[in-house]
Structures are given as C-alpha cells and as structure tokens.
C-alpha cells in the first residue's frame, strides 16, 4: 500500500506524479464528481474493470478506442468533447487516460481544451508512455500536415 509521490516543477506550474501500488484509491487524485476514462481497447478488460471498480462512487463515461495514429485526431477529439459537453462535464471534472502514448496525448489534449481545462490523470501502460509522453505536459493531436 506504499504510495510514492514525485513533485515536478516547471516554469509555469507544479504537479505531482504518483507511483506505486494501490494509488487508484487516492481521493486527492480525482477530486471530481464525473470522470471520463479514455482507454486503449487492447487493455485487458480485467484491468479496465479494476479501474472502473475503484471509481464506482463517480459518474463515469468510458471510451475504449481502437488505437492508431489516426485516433490522435481532431475528429476523434471533437466527438469525445461533444459527448462530454452533452453530459455536462465541467472544470471540476476529470479525464483519465488509460493506455499508451496515443491515448495519453489525445486525452490530455481533450482535457486541456474542454471548458478551458478539465482535471487530468494519466495512467500510462507502456514503457515509452511512462518515461516520455506522461511526463512534461505535452498535449497534441495529428493533423493532415503531420504527426504530432
């Protein structure tokens, strides 16, 4: 049950990175009424169900995406944002990315532009996402002119 926290300090902000066992139940992690989980459809259902079970007290919206570079697009982002707005998500609510770098980039982009910024939690599931995409605050999607 040991939880570890690393504080990242940048020029513009400070934020925590939590790591360790059983951190999903950390109440300070979410502090929201509604949570949107955006997940890679290759994540085993048993793991997604464990996450969902830990969030049972929240109003949940779950997206399981077929992940490719085409997923990291304005079209996909707009569809999710429109649905979040229809469900009255607001700035006090949270988006959780549960997957690799593509899911993290898309989810953080959505969180950053919806209602001028929703809370964001990244649960990276690939090594590259753990050491690169989940640290540093990069948000981005691909465009017709190139990969972000």
Annotate each predicted stretch with a short phrase.
Residues 46-47, 105-106, 130:
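Phosphate- and divalent-cation-binding pockets in alpha/beta enzyme and binding domains
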Residues 9, 109, 114-148:
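A glycine/threonine-rich phosphate-anchoring loop and its flanking beta-alpha core
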Residues 1-94:
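ATP/NTP phosphate-donor binding region
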Residues 93-112:
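Glycine/serine-rich anion-binding loops at beta->alpha junctions
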Residues 77-83, 100, 113, 128-131:
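Hydrophobic, well-ordered secondary-structure scaffolds
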């Amino acid at each position: 049950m040991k939880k570890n926290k690393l504080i990242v300090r940048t020029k513009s902000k400070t934020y925590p990175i939590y790591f360790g066992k059983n951190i999903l139940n950390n109440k300070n992690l979410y502090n929201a009424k509604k949570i949107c989980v955006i997940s890679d459809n290759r994540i085993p259902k048993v793991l997604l169900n464990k996450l969902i079970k830990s969030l049972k007290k929240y109003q949940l919206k779950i997206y399981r995406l077929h992940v490719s570079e085409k997923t990291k697009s304005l079209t996909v982002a707009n569809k999710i944002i429109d649905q979040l707005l229809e469900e009255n998500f607001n700035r006090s609510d949270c988006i959780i990315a549960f997957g690799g770098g593509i899911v993290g980039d898309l989810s953080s982009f959505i969180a950053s532009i919806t209602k001028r910024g929703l809370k964001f939690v990244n649960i990276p599931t690939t090594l590259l996402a753990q050491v690169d995409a989940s640290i540093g605050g990069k948000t981005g999607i691909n465009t017709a002119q190139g990969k972000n």
